[in-house]
């Protein structure tokens, strides 16, 4: 899938968790910030500053929000919300998980 948009792309990758998560930051013409990335099979914990919406592009994952005891699963075309100043665990098994993260 490809989209044509007016944006500035940070061509230097953000590499986290010894390369298990790699993303690129994008700033749209209106100042909106996003990142596009991939998470390889692993269970990782992310902290958030601003609220985030994680949009699944390919692959699947299970997530557990801070304060929750239950895991929720998401696949292509599905999204989940993460509150700001919080955290979430994400579990990827099998195929890599491709995502778009919408900030704010």
Swiss-Prot record:
Family label: Belongs to the nucleoside phosphorylase PpnP family.
Pfam family, one: Ppnp
Lineage, top ranks: Bacteria, Pseudomonadati, Pseudomonadota, Betaproteobacteria, Burkholderiales
InterPro entries per the UniProt record, alphabetical: Ppnp (IPR009664), RmlC-like_jellyroll (IPR014710), RmlC_Cupin_sf (IPR011051)
Superkingdom, taxonomy of origin: Bacteria
GO CC entries: cytosol
GO MF annotation list: guanosine phosphorylase activity; purine-nucleoside phosphorylase activity; thymidine phosphorylase activity; uridine phosphorylase activity
Catalytic reactions on record: a purine D-ribonucleoside + phosphate = a purine nucleobase + alpha-D-ribose 1-phosphate; adenosine + phosphate = alpha-D-ribose 1-phosphate + adenine; cytidine + phosphate = cytosine + alpha-D-ribose 1-phosphate; guanosine + phosphate = alpha-D-ribose 1-phosphate + guanine
Gene that encodes it: ppnP
The protein, known as: Pyrimidine/purine nucleoside phosphorylase
Protein's job: Catalyzes the phosphorolysis of diverse nucleosides, yielding D-ribose 1-phosphate and the respective free bases. Can use uridine, adenosine, guanosine, cytidine, thymidine, inosine and xanthosine as substrates. Also catalyzes the reverse reactions.
EC id: 2.4.2.1, 2.4.2.2
Entry keyword set: Glycosyltransferase, Transferase
Gene3D superfamilies: Jelly Rolls
UniProt enzyme class: transferase
